[in-house]
Amino acid sequence: EMTRPLKELTEAAQKVAGGNLEVNIDCESKDEVGVLADSVQQMVNHLRHYIDYVNEQAYTDALTGVANKAAYKEYVDKLDKRAADEKIKYAVVVMDINNLKKINDNFGHEFGDMLIRDASRLIQKGFKDHIVYRIGGDEFVIIIEQAEKAICDELLRNFDDGIVVFNKNNTKYEQKIQIARGIAFYEPDCIDSFASVFREADHAMYENKVMQKSMQTAPPAAGQS
């Protein structure tokens, strides 16, 4: 009668040793075998939670809490394969915080980090249904699968409006947050790779950055001061 529970426990232990942590040991025995089975199950549960925690840390940006560059690279590799096989379409949004180096030089990196966190929260709020990746000091990427241009345009308009509202109501510091953004689309049957779509979005972002900076330095219109 002890043979069957021991056999099940042995099989479960072998699965765990092979890397399968999705095991549930169902042993109703109240003897030493049952105690051992419960202990092994607890060990598996703890190990599963620990691995989940390690994975989360490995793919999370420490400063902002968004997905990091490692998560971004892994997702992009999978997306390139899926785009070819499944004929999906997607949009790539590239964002860059304006004047971050100047801000760090003038106010210090602690202030710069606070501004990055605030910018990250604005991006997450504007694209709350999508994963935000921080891939550089001041650079963020959002990938929108099954993207429709009209919906993406609305997301960007709302995002821009959100920055205006934040800067108007922000009492923590006088420095205004400015985030340049660009977008590009990948369509099914397109021969482009993710890298080429990213380059297009990155170029659009730099054009937006130039426009924002020119608006900053432009003289006031007649009747304005």
Question: What are these model-predicted stretches?
Answer:
Residues 12, 17-22, 86-88, 98:
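Flexible, glycine-biased helix-capping/connector loops in cytosolic signal-transduction modules
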Residues 55, 68-91, 98-125, 133-137, ...:
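Conserved long alpha-helical elements within nucleotide-processing catalytic cores of c-di-GMP signaling
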Residues 109, 149, 153-160, 170-173, ...:
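Catalytic-core segments of nucleotide cyclases and related cyclic-nucleotide turnover enzymes
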Residues 13-16, 20, 43, 79, ...:
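Signal-transduction coiled-coil helices of two-component systems
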Residues 21, 49-68, 78-81:
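Amphipathic HAMP/coiled-coil signal-transducing linker helices
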Residues 11-15, 22, 26-53:
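Amphipathic coiled-coil signaling helices used for dimeric signal transmission
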Residues 1-14:
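Cytoplasmic juxtamembrane amphipathic helix immediately C-terminal to a transmembrane segment
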Residues 2, 29-36, 112, 152, ...:
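The cytosolic transmitter module of two-component sensor histidine kinases
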